[in-house]
Amino acid sequence: MAEEFITHSAEETTAWGRELAARLKPPVLVLLSGDLGSGKTTLTKGIVSGLGAAREEDVTSPTFTLLHTYREDEPVFHGDLYRIENFHDFETLGMEDLFSKPGIVILEWSERFPLPLPWPSVRVRLEHLGGDSRRITVI
């Protein structure tokens, strides 16, 4: 059953991410989808900080680097699949290695994920409602 939340600011979206973090148990994939500017990275700031893996201000979009690692001992990865076109791209970037050790993998643009899901997953859809408001749907 889907859960739906409305946030009215970036701070509320980040806070909701911290709440979600408390429910995550590795290994798990957090699959984020939503249009450009819908709040995927803002939500990730809350998740990563809620896990104690990094401070909010240290969490940035991996659009150009494609992957950020926030913790190695209990891995927390944040990837961006926007530029991934096919399995070959995914494989060439070594992204399959994310699943070599149980951890938490947060993927933006998850609709581009080219593999069967190797771990349990939480799907989160973000929608921009105008201004700073977002609809967050968790499946």
Annotate each predicted stretch with a short phrase.
Residues 54-68:
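Short beta-strand-centered segment that lines the nucleotide-binding/catalytic pocket of NTP-utilizing
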Residues 29-31:
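Short hydrophobic/aromatic beta-strand immediately N-terminal to the Walker A/P-loop
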Residues 21-27:
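Phosphate-binding P-loop
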Residues 40:
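Conserved lysine of the Walker
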Residues 33-35:
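P-loop (Walker A) phosphate-binding loop of NTP-binding proteins
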Residues 1-16:
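N-terminal pre-Walker A segment at the start of P-loop NTPase domains
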Residues 3-4, 85-139:
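Short phosphate-coordinating micro-motif centered on Lys-Gly-acidic
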